[in-house]
Amino acid sequence: MFIKEVASSLYAWDLADEGIATIADNLQERANCNCMYLVGVMHYEKRPLTSLYYTHNTKRKFYLPENSRAYYRLNMDSFKNTKLKSCFTERDFLKGVDWLDVLTEEARKRGMKTGVELSHTIFDTNIAREQYPEMMQRDVNGGIVKDLQGLLCPNHPDVHEFQRAMFYDSVKNHDVDIVQTCLLTFGAGQPVKAPWFFAPWMDIENPSMGAILGLADGGCFCEHCRAKAIKWGYDWERIVHDMKTIHAIAHATPYAFQDYLMENNLTLGSNLTDCMLYIEYPGLLDFIKFRIQSITELFADIYKSVHEAKPGIDFRYNNHVRYPEYTGISFKDIAPYVDSVRESDYSEQRGAPDKFVFKRNTLHKIRRGIGFDKDLISALAVRPNATPELIRESLGVLAQCGIDGLSLGHYDGAHMEHLDAIKQGMSEYNITIVK
């Protein structure tokens, strides 16, 4: 099997603590890496994420990043048409250094590809809530969508322009081959659980209709979404009416929304399909279609901008959700506006109890959507809780899935023997890197 790359993400504090040369040595020699990319704007999330402590960082045991700070230079003229302006790191040991340049300069010395990732949130969500509440996503009842990381509405003109400008400037002013994003799009709400007393005969945590009912808590229902939906020919009043009904069903209990309680219980406890919900509530289907059209429009604008900045750039979407269509992502719709897709399944760190069925299924779903002229990159977990044996087994599965590259998740929490397992597994399953 032939692939184009083995990539690894890195953080600015990794480079500051361990040194880019040491990191690059480890990645090249142990894991066959030929691509490094900086998570240039990182959301608010403790590192390492899946374990208590770092495994090979001699400077610190863990790190608590700032909220959505940029770790490289940006030309602020690029943001003249939006109220939102990028925020930069305020940590003394990181300030004053363009960490993306540090990475790219070392990578080029070694003949490696380079990239930058704009992560889940690319603007400080605390500042957004305090100073720009009108830009936050709204639920069907007009409240700000509840989400741990905060969700800006991509249909708000200032948000849309800020997101476009961030990608454009990152590509225009840096020596990168790839610009990748796992940008949070529309809130999908939280899956609804079945009644507790169904537990003897079903998994109440994962009823088949739980995720789609949870959409009723997602966004966005702001004035800008309303105006755009009407402009595109959607019946906005029907969308709002049907989503309010689904919201009542989703939240029905013996003490609230009682008129919908039996509907809730029988929907969650049955083998009803989402198809029937679309028939009964056409506004639900329109809501999903509108969100997909909105995100496709955003991706089209970003794609055009980054290719104007650098025609050969690889604009890569990093899929990180189980049901992307519930967040506005349709792989068939965005296919013309991406160059590649990374799938962020990390079954290895959970012991792969399903024998990598979900990983296979998801890769096939993405390939079905993007076709065969766009690259498909599969993630592997090299973090604690994975094992060298599982990593090699995963590579054996991936060798059957028609992927175009591998991406390690993530170096900061990796065990060195897990990096070694990448090289070993590639040899065992005849996975070869070609340019």
Report the location of each language-model feature.
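Polysaccharide-binding and catalytic clefts of secreted carbohydrate-active enzymes
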Residues: 119-121, 132-337, 346-347
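Substrate-binding cleft of secreted/luminal carbohydrate-active enzymes
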Residues: 39-43, 338, 343-355, 377-434
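Aromatic-lined carbohydrate-binding/catalytic grooves of carbohydrate-active enzymes
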Residues: 33-94, 422
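Hydrophobic faces of well-ordered beta-strands that scaffold small-molecule active sites
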Residues: 4-10, 34-38, 114-118, 179-181, ...
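Surface-exposed amphipathic alpha-helices with a cationic face
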Residues: 28, 100-115, 299-313, 363-375, ...
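The substrate-binding groove and active-site-proximal loops of carbohydrate-active enzymes
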Residues: 6-16, 75-97, 145-161, 282-295, ...
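Short, acidic/polar
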Residues: 14-29, 159-170, 323-336, 387-399
